[in-house]
Amino acid sequence: MTETTKTHVILLACGSFNPITKGHIQMFERARDYLHKTGRFIVIGGIVSPVHDSYGKQGLVSSRHRLIMCQLAVQNSDWIRVDPWECYQDTWQTTCSVLEHHRDLMKRVTGCILSNVNTPSMTPVIGQPRNETSQPIYQNNNAPSKPTAAKILGKVGESLSRICCVRPPVERFTFVDENANLGTVMRYEEIELRILLLCGSDLLESFCIPGLWNEADMEVIVGDFGIVVVPRDAADTDRIMNHSSILRKYKNNIMVVKDDINHPMSVVSSTKSRLALQHGDGHVVDYLSQPVIDYILKSQLYINASG
């Protein structure tokens, strides 16, 4: 399978991130590594989407603080970014609506429809036109033949002037080499792109709680988009999925990260990081990156038990 025939993926994580922990970032890294190892996917970007203030969770600090902490946590990443759209809405948004927003945003920016799990495009990839020197579409010093997340997401996020997109009758993106001489011949490459929800096994297990999730939303989340699950505390994801008819129905759309890394809940837990802050526990450095800790102390967050 070539680079262009692999499915290109953007991982989207929704949550309180109150505060964002090292474990949250590790989930992105582990998910990307696992998807790459399958040989079927190329992860080109990750999106952290903090929940709206009206979510109403006890101890939830304002989105202004949570957005800044998330930005500090990913400031050295070349492929994970923080998106404020969910926080900037008038009220709380469902996970389903956040996924749909990002799908529709990509569609508006590129003029194409994103592929989803159930209807992948089967059209052959468009290659280089004849009589044209073979040259990688995406270039950087380290990997001249591979797209970089920063460049592709930058293209999507900046403006249409940085992306030229044809409108094929299939669910594909077409990125055009911005350095090509468009006056003579256009070099282009077609890739399939999906947005997948990244979550821990605790969120997957919450799908099994009657009445907690809207069933129509679950159908869209799992059936149309798909989920990448990072197990926590050796969770039995097969047992979890067997407890939900919707999860069983779309089991093939749920990718469980399988690796040899121990990923205890405490590493990800925002609750334990807040407790460590309140108690002056030096082990807070195990949970939070130093820039996040510095911001929390400067802003006097989580000092009181009330948050």
From Swiss-Prot:
Activity regulation (record text): Inhibited by P1-(adenosine-5')-P3-(nicotinamide-riboside-5')-triphosphate (Np3AD) and P1-(adenosine-5')-P4-(nicotinamide-riboside-5')-tetraphosphate (Np4AD).
Residues binding ATP, per UniProt: 24, 271-274
Gene Ontology cellular component list: axon; cytoplasmic vesicle membrane; Golgi apparatus; Golgi membrane
Reaction catalysis annotation: beta-nicotinamide D-ribonucleotide + ATP + H(+) = diphosphate + NAD(+); nicotinate beta-D-ribonucleotide + ATP + H(+) = deamido-NAD(+) + diphosphate
Binding site for NAD(+): 16-17, 92, 95, 200, 202, 212-213, 232
Co-factor remark: Divalent metal cations. Mg(2+) confers the highest activity.
Top-rank taxon: Eukaryota
Cell location: Golgi apparatus membrane; Cytoplasmic vesicle membrane; Cytoplasm; Cell projection, Axon
InterPro entries tied to this protein: Cyt_trans-like (IPR004821), Euk_NMN_adenylyltrnsfrase (IPR051182), NMNAT_euk (IPR045094), Rossmann-like_a/b/a_fold (IPR014729)
Lipid moiety-binding residues (S-palmitoyl cysteine): 164-165
Chief location category: Golgi
SUPFAM superfamilies, alphabetized: Nucleotidylyl transferase
Cofactor section: Mg(2+)
Processing after translation: Degraded in response to injured neurite. Degradation is caused by polyubiquitination by MYCBP2 after recognition by FBXO45.
Pathway assignment: Cofactor biosynthesis; NAD(+) biosynthesis; NAD(+) from nicotinamide D-ribonucleotide: step 1/1; Cofactor biosynthesis; NAD(+) biosynthesis; deamido-NAD(+) from nicotinate D-ribonucleotide: step 1/1
GO biological process, one term: NAD biosynthetic process
GO molecular function (one): ATP binding
Keywords, alphabetical: ATP-binding, Cell projection, Cytoplasm, Cytoplasmic vesicle, Golgi apparatus, Lipoprotein, Membrane, NAD, Nucleotide-binding, Nucleotidyltransferase, Palmitate, Pyridine nucleotide biosynthesis, Transferase, Ubl conjugation
Entry membrane topology: Lipid-anchor
UniProt function note: Nicotinamide/nicotinate-nucleotide adenylyltransferase that acts as an axon maintenance factor. Axon survival factor required for the maintenance of healthy axons: acts by delaying Wallerian axon degeneration, an evolutionarily conserved process that drives the loss of damaged axons. Catalyzes the formation of NAD(+) from nicotinamide mononucleotide (NMN) and ATP. Can also use the deamidated form; nicotinic acid mononucleotide (NaMN) as substrate but with a lower efficiency. Cannot use triazofurin monophosphate (TrMP) as substrate. Also catalyzes the reverse reaction, i.e.
Similarity comment: Belongs to the eukaryotic NMN adenylyltransferase family.
Assembly with partners or alone: Monomer.
Protein's recorded name: Nicotinamide/nicotinic acid mononucleotide adenylyltransferase 2
Organism per entry: Bos taurus (Bovine)
